[in-house]
């Protein structure tokens, strides 16, 4: 789980039941966790993606933190990604669909689930980019966003901070290589456990080469129908764009000299490290950052680049072998994972949370077969995160009744299947 803009995002695969202490949340969707109120059946959810390059590594060349401490402490810079605007989207069959505002035009999608009850339409990322993506700025130009944020006073402050020695506000966890043989001549890798970031901060390597993805429903999507990755750009010069590139969308900011650690060798009950991601709470880390007094510094802009990350889109199955997870297989004609039909009444006997549902499950309700594309997000992603109070208020029969009445012409009859 990570925290982005004050909201929690959990690994969709872990939510679906594939929880693992070694989950790196890479190549996967991070879905916004709902904690309050009763979610709408067709609710639009925010989501972000994390790629395989986003795992943090040790800040090898940085100054050592002063103070007595454990030998496992490393130094991870804190990055903030500021989006210029925000767009809403929905996950439909594992793919991102962008909500179209009034005034936009798009070809009507074939999938009826791309329509909302109020008449709004969704289109795929690819279709959106083809029609509405802004042109990338020419080489050597300064983007409007960076111009606005780069006043003379900010430039002076940034120059002063770059010339100052790096400051660390930690009374603990000095990196002692003599006490840590594993670090001799090598760079320790950060643990593979999931790492959260405090109050909208995003972690990265010290060189800022690996940055977590922009909010998956970014306002100006710049990836193909798979994923979005942030790569750093200069604040004053932008590389010559390729035909598939789009304009930079976000500014990347950081607290210079302030680091958090993804490793710690202290005992769980007696860790004094104020910048420890393992033993400090969100509130403590946020307080540590604020009390440092170090202002945010703009270190450049992030541009969306094309990377195949969505494991649902990157299917490598063949006619002879299917390597999809049993619950997520969408391969046509797959002999390993066949379509199964379950009666709606099964929920009353086993409960919603106990019924085994897959992408190929069809729920028989009122003489109709309801494919997973109509209920997957709600039953598999939203319901498991509901509180006991929310579950008590949930009328699953009424929910399915409304779904079938809305989409009846597009559902198969159970008697003819």
Swiss-Prot record:
Residues 264-337 are annotated as: 2 X 16 AA repeat of C-X-C-X(4)-C-X-C-X-X-C-X-X-H. Residues 1-40 bind DNA. It is found in: Nucleus. InterPro entries: Copper_Homeo_Regul, Cu_fist_DNA-bd_dom, Cu_fist_DNA-bd_dom_sf. Residues 153-178 have a biased composition (Basic and acidic residues). Keywords: Activator, Copper, DNA-binding, Metal-binding, Nucleus, Phosphoprotein, Repeat, Transcription, Transcription regulation, Zinc. Present with 14800 molecules/cell in log phase SD medium. This is Metal-binding activator 1. It comes from Saccharomyces cerevisiae (strain ATCC 204508 / S288c) (Baker's yeast).
């Amino acid at each position: 789980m990570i925290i982005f803009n004050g909201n929690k995002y959990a690994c969709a695969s872990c939510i679906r039941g594939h929880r693992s202490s070694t989950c790196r949340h890479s190549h996967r969707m991070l879905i916004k966790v709902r904690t309050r109120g009763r979610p709408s059946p067709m609710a639009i959810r925010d989501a972000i993606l994390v790629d395989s390059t986003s795992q943090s590594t040790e800040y090898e060349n940085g100054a050592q933190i002063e103070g007595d401490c454990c030998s496992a402490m490393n130094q991870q810079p804190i990055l903030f990604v500021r989006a210029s605007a925000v767009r809403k989207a929905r996950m439909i069959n594992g793919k991102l669909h962008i909500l179209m505002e009034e005034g936009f035009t798009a070809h009507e999608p074939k999938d009826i689930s791309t329509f909302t009850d109020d008449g709004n339409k969704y289109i795929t990322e690819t279709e959106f980019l083809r029609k509405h993506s802004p042109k990338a700025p020419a080489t050597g130009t300064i983007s409007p966003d960076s111009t606005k944020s780069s006043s003379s006073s900010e430039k002076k402050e940034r120059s002063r901070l770059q010339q100052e020695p790096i400051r660390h506000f930690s009374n603990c966890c000095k990196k002692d290589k003599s006490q840590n043989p594993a670090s001799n001549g090598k760079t320790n890798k950060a643990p593979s456990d999931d790492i959260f970031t405090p109050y909208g901060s995003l972690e990265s390597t010290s060189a800022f080469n690996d940055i977590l993805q922009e909010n998956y429903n970014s306002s100006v999507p710049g990836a193909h129908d798979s994923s979005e990755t942030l790569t750093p750009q200069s604040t004053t010069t932008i590389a010559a764009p390729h035909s598939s590139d789009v304009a930079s969308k976000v500014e990347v900011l950081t607290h210079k000299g302030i680091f958090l650690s993804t490793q710690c060798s202290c005992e769980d009950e007696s860790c004094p490290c104020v910048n420890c991601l393992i033993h400090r709470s969100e509130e403590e880390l946020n307080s540590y950052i604020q009390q440092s007094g170090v202002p945010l510094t703009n270190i450049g802009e992030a541009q969306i680049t094309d990377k195949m990350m969505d494991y649902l889109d990157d299917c490598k199955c063949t006619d002879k072998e299917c390597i999809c997870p049993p619950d997520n297989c969408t391969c046509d004609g797959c002999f390993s994972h066949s379509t199964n039909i379950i009666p709606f009444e099964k929920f009353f006997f086993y409960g919603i949370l106990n019924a085994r549902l897959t992408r190929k499950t069809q729920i028989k309700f009122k003489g109709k077969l309801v494919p997973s594309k109509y209920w997957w997000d709600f039953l598999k992603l939203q319901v498991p995160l509901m509180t006991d109070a929310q579950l008590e208020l949930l009328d699953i029969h009424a929910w399915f009744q409304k779904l079938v009445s809305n989409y009846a012409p597009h559902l198969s009859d159970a008697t003819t299947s």
